[in-house]
Swiss-Prot record:
One GO molecular-function entry: transcription coregulator activity
Record note on quaternary structure: Component of the Mediator complex.
Main location as per UniProt: nucleus
GO cellular component: mediator complex
Organism: Aspergillus niger (strain ATCC MYA-4892 / CBS 513.88 / FGSC A1513)
Stated name of the protein: Mediator of RNA polymerase II transcription subunit 31
Biased composition annotated in UniProt, kind: Pro residues: 1-18
Function as written in the Swiss-Prot or TrEMBL entry: Component of the Mediator complex, a coactivator involved in the regulated transcription of nearly all RNA polymerase II-dependent genes. Mediator functions as a bridge to convey information from gene-specific regulatory proteins to the basal RNA polymerase II transcription machinery. Mediator is recruited to promoters by direct interactions with regulatory proteins and serves as a scaffold for the assembly of a functional preinitiation complex with RNA polymerase II and the general transcription factors.
PANTHER family per record: MEDIATOR OF RNA POLYMERASE II TRANSCRIPTION SUBUNIT 31
Family: Belongs to the Mediator complex subunit 31 family.
KW Transcription (keyword) present: yes
Length: 151
């Protein structure tokens, strides 16, 4: 039986293979972070993980250094970002631009606190379409024409 690494030693990312359950679980989670409305759901449902006080009082915002749940989740997000941004792993992302942008933004304590605000989510949702790289080979002729008109 495999022993887990000591708590002070960072965990190694799972091998990038779709037959590895941990890899597919983390792929599904980071892929869901590309959806701003999922980020909003996390902020509303699990505010303690993001360092948000449920009362909504900005003066009482939890500090990551004092909340072990927020501290652990921030460390987990940093761990995920450290390897999903590499080409070896990013190739598996359906929406790499939006996913990696969300992971990068989630590294910031202020962003983790601010995503509970609807205006932040709406701005993030508005940038998703423009930020996604377009793969011309995957587009049909009609969609390309519509994109040209929008430009």
């Amino acid at each position: 039986m495999e022993q887990p690494p000591p708590a002070d030693q960072p965990q190694q990312p799972p091998p990038p293979t779709l037959t590895n359950p941990r890899f597919t679980l983390e792929l599904e989670f980071v892929s869901s972070l590309a959806n701003p409305y999922y980020l909003s759901h996390l902020a509303v449902t699990y505010p303690n993980l993001l360092g948000i006080n449920k009362s909504g009082d900005d003066s009482d915002v939890n500090n990551d250094s004092t909340d072990p749940d927020a501290q652990g989740f921030a460390a987990y997000l940093a761990y995920l970002y450290s390897y999903w941004k590499t080409p070896e792993y990013a190739q598996f992302l359906t929406h790499p631009g939006a996913t990696l942008r969300a992971l990068r933004l989630l590294q910031e304590e202020t962003f983790r606190r601010d995503i509970i605000r609807p205006d932040v989510i709406e701005r993030l949702a508005g940038t998703d379409i423009a930020a996604e790289p377009v793969d011309p080979a995957a587009e049909s002729g009609d969609q390309e024409g519509e994109q040209a008109k929008a430009s």
